[in-house]
Amino acid sequence: MFDLRYNPGGDLDAITEVLDYLLPEGPIVHIVDAEGKEEVISSDANELDVPMMVLCNGSTASAGELFTCALQDYGKAEIVGTQTYGKGTMQTIISLPDNTGLGISYRMYDPPYSENYEGKGVTPDYVVELDDSLNDKNIYKITDEEDNQMQKAIEILQNGSEKFHVKKAS
């Protein structure tokens, strides 16, 4: 289970390296620069064939969304939570003399087969809002037992999923 809730993204090279271990042969990401030049990063034929779950929410962004969407595109994971943020761009930060910075988007990245999620986000397979009673609680202090999104993911793993041909645990 990958808990990507509140994950703002990260290093594209790192995420594609991890996805290469998880996905079958095929595209991981299509990167398009400002001139329209496209680069495709692909996975080899070595894949991990186990049931996978991803937890996401409106604070899952950028490379976290690519990870979520790539697993979803290949039918390798069930996605539980709420719509992600919607950031399908790569940025560079230019430091300014007043100690502020300017973020400039310079590339778009598209998931393997889905449309770019820029401004839209990734829709989970199971839309599950975090219980209202937990909204004011520090996410890191919510136990697995009281986390209804986590409990839904565990329920799917225990009961099986047609998506990745998992039989009910005995």
Describe every region a protein language model picked out:
Residues 2, 52-55, 71, 114, ...:
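Terminal peptide-recognition signature
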Residues 8-62, 89-94, 110:
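Gly/Ser/Thr-rich loop/hinge elements
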Residues 1-3, 29-31, 51-56, 78-81, ...:
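Structural recognition of the beta-strand scaffold that forms the well-ordered cores
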Residues 74-87:
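Short, well-structured beta-strand/strand-turn elements
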Residues 91-94, 102-136:
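Conserved P-loop NTPase
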Residues 2, 18-20, 68-74, 95-96:
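Short, solvent-exposed amphipathic alpha-helical segments in soluble enzyme
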Residues 13-17, 23, 62, 66, ...:
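Extracytoplasmic/secreted proteins, especially bacterial periplasmic and envelope-associated proteins
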Residues 3-8, 31, 129-170:
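C-terminal recognition in membrane/secretory proteostasis and scaffolding
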